């Protein structure tokens, strides 16, 4: 730092005279960061010691704790009076903040010098929920029960933060008492005069309160929900109890047969729809039309006679059995066949089905 220039009229005549500088001399003005030394006036070499070491300065009785230094030193052997621009309270003893106490872990907060321990408690909100404060107050009571006003009193006395505004946190405490299942209301006895009921802590919830951490007890589920969940679990464990619906169902519901004799039920896969019955009937009509004709397709006629005749015999037997189930199936047999009889002569293919000739033009 540059030395502070002093006015000419404040200097003594002896200090205004030029003196030769020596290598071992200390500078006229210096600032020691460790000791917060303020600049001093220039003195004659005969008035100061030959060497000034830092260890020679005495430390004050009450240091500045947040810097860990030696504090401001107003050594009378170095300067008879402080500089006029320094405030008189700069080197005044400071009050130590937060004495050693196990609650704050020794001098962890000793670097703060703005307020005392009580002022800190008023500024900082306690790290406890309202339910924890209520449980703490009830546990500290002699008979483990307190009224609402006694809970207010305990919170305000032990936590000065809540002394500032009482309306807000008192409403929160009332809501926690009424909504939390761990707090039980106990009516007053007849011989106990006073106003208001007592509040106590549920014995099942006492273990849940541990060092200010209060976990709210959940309400048990209703019996209906538990029974429903148990039923769903049984259904998943025993899937064989349920019967799966058949993969193939008949086209129409089965009705009791008018005939007295009993018959064996047919499997679902053999049930025929009206569309299939109509198709087989049309094929039977085609077989009847081609049986009286002679054409070049002899092998085809023979195969068709064999296959369709067997189908017709099977249909004739099944149609009698299904006459009661499908009374309108005769309409399908009376219809004209979908396909006409096989042609006796070969027909010419349409032009769009014929293979196109190769392109004979020039490329």
Swiss-Prot record:
UniProt subcellular location: Nucleus
Disulfide linkage: none
Basic and acidic residues composition bias: residue spans: 231-243
Region Disordered: start-end pairs: 1-24, 210-269, 344-363
Annotated Gene Ontology cellular component terms: nucleus
Record field: compositional bias (Low complexity): 1-18, 244-258, 347-363
Protein name: Forkhead box protein I1
Organism: Xenopus tropicalis
């Amino acid at each position: 730092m540059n030395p502070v220039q002093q006015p000419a009229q404040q200097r003594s005549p002896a200090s205004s005279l030029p003196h030769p500088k020596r290598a071992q001399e200390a500078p006229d003005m210096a600032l020691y960061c460790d000791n917060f030394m303020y600049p001093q006036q220039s003195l004659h070499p005969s008035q100061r010691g030959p060497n000034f070491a830092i260890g020679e300065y005495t430390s004050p009785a009450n240091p500045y704790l947040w810097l860990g230094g030696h504090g401001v030193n107003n050594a009378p052997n170095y300067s008879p009076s402080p500089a006029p621009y320094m405030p008189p309270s700069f080197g005044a003893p400071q009050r130590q903040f937060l004495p050693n106490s196990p609650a704050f872990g020794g001098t962890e907060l000793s670097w703060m010098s703005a307020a005392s321990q009580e002022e800190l408690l008023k500024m900082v909100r306690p790290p406890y929920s309202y339910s924890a404060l209520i449980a703490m107050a009830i546990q500290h009571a002699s008979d483990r029960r307190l009224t609402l006003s006694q809970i207010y009193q305990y919170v305000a006395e032990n936590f000065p933060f809540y002394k500032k505004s009482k309306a807000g946190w008192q409403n929160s405490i009332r809501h926690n008492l009424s909504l939390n299942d761990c707090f039980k209301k106990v009516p007053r006895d007849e011989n106990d005069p006073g106003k208001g009921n007592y509040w106590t802590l549920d014995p099942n919830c006492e273990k849940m309160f541990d060092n200010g951490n209060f976990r709210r007890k959940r309400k048990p589920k209703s019996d209906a929900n538990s029974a429903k969940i148990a039923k769903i679990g049984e259904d998943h464990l025993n899937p064989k109890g349920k019967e799966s619906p058949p993969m193939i169902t008949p086209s129409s519901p089965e009705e009791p047969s008018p005939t007295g004799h009993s018959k064996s039920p047919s499997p679902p896969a053999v049930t025929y729809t009206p569309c299939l019955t109509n198709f087989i009937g049309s094929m039977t009509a085609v077989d009847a039309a081609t049986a009286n004709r002679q054409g070049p397709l002899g092998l085809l006629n023979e195969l068709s006679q064999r296959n369709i005749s067997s189908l017709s015999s099977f249909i004739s037997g099944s149609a009698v059995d299904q006459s009661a189930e499908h009374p309108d199936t005769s309409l399908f047999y009376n219809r004209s066949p979908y396909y006409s009889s096989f042609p006796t002569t070969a027909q010419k293919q349409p032009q769009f089905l014929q293979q196109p000739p190769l392109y004979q033009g020039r490329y």
